[in-house]
Amino acid sequence: IHTGVRVFGIIPKKNGFQISFSKDGKKGMISGEAVILAAGSKAAAKLGSDGSGYDLAKMLGHKLVPVVPALVQLRCREKLYRQVAGVRTHGKVTVFIDGTETASDIGELQLTDYGISGIPVFQISRYAARGLYEKKEVFAELDFMPDFGDVEFLQMLKERKIRLDGLVMEQYFNGLFHKKLAGALLKRIGISGTMPVHDLGEENLERLCRICKHFRTY
């Protein structure tokens, strides 16, 4: 049994395999009837998963697909994320590749100063990474009210306008969204937080519905 060694070569032989390794500057060689290659990927170099396993796989005749990040957060271009950093909210994230809906997941979204994170984002990140690697157009769409359809949510917004008459827009989303998120959504479509709820017209209600249900981010 050899431990703490670095394998740098595996050569198929007639009756098995010849394995070359090194340890403390010294090289060695052993043979075996079978080889189990479990080197990991390249996400934990300090633990040995530094990508060298791919070279060993090639020596055995395997073909490799391009390696891209998976189970990761997504960095987004929009500056507004600095405004909502630290907010966690229930939502749905959908990734689009060249305009085609490719994958989606629902759960707790984490908004950071650089973009989006959380389990749902991890689940769809590999599709985004592959699309970016292939130089395709990639964007994500966030739905902050995934339990409601567009028509249903628009009706809710209309009813809130009636109930909250007398307040201002920065109070309109109280009880629905975190204050930071509410402010960012209003800013995104150019509605002032000091505007009276009473002045919220049909067009702006529809815009609010769209931005809450179909928040596009690159």
Feature-to-residue mapping (PLM):
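A glycine-rich dinucleotide-binding beta-alpha-beta segment and adjacent secondary-structure elements
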Residues: 3-5, 183-218
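A conserved short coil-to-beta-strand element within the FAD-binding core of flavoproteins
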Residues: 3-16
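An anion/pyrophosphate-binding glycine-rich loop and adjacent beta-alpha core
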Residues: 63-66, 75-200
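Core beta-strand elements of the Rossmann-like FAD/NAD(P) dinucleotide-binding domain
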Residues: 23-34, 104-107
